[in-house]
Amino acid sequence: MNDIVDIVVGFDQREAVAYHSFTQSVIEKSSIPVRFLPLNINSLTNYKETHEDGSNEFIYSRFLVPYLMNFKGWAIYADGDMVCLEDIKKLWNLRDNKYAIQVVKHDYKTKIKNKYWGNKNENYPRKNWSSLILWNCEHKSHKILSPDFIQKQTGAFLHRFNWIKDSEIGEIYKEWNWLAMEYEEKQDINLIHYTIGTPCFEEYENSSLSFHWKKSFLSMLDGYFKKNKLD
């Protein structure tokens, strides 16, 4: 198993602060070395985004993770609009080589019709399964995940993991991908996903569980001479 945890994180310049707040939250809690790779569309030289239905810039590039890891070892993929409240080692320790991926298998109908930037928030099978993934990058089923292959596939095919068997999809408990504004507020959460909108956006500044995001954001500003004016 890897000595360093590789974490690939969705990055969209329009909410760059979300990426940095998330990585800050992981760094603060982690008891093992971590290595971040931002999924920045500008730096993916062998991949050209051809899909036109994405609500953010990493909605399809996340499926490049095994390719980016040279089809070796394991990696975590996480959307950028998250905050980690627990040691990432505990998630890392859930890896099971009999699976190609491991995800939280959400089963819900959304309560909210629209999300950030006015995007429609529609229901579809396996919604939000792909927002947090433990990737077994060397699993044989992933060998087809080349940049060219991903560019040609539909969102439904990719986000439902249709290139692998259902038996190859392991399950992680919901506390590792807790959906703010969709699930109730509670104390024992490991990772919050602000899937409707990150509290960096004005309309979600005081939304459910926003306190945790603001705390990570302010911690990320340590060393900034104007931080005291933002507290």
List where the protein language model places each region:
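GT-A fold catalytic core of metal-dependent nucleotide-sugar glycosyltransferases
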Residues: 61-111, 134, 141
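Short, acidic, metal-binding catalytic loop of nucleotide-sugar glycosyltransferases
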Residues: 25-33
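Conserved catalytic core of nucleotide-sugar-dependent glycosyltransferases
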Residues: 94-158
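Alpha-helix N-cap/loop-to-helix initiation residues
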Residues: 15-16, 84
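Active-site-proximal specificity loops/subdomain of glycosyltransferases
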Residues: 35-68
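A short acidic, often aromatic-flanked loop/helix-cap motif at beta-alpha or helix-coil junctions
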Residues: 42-47, 109-111, 177-181
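A glycosyltransferase accessory/donor-loop signature
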Residues: 2-5, 11, 32, 36-40, ...
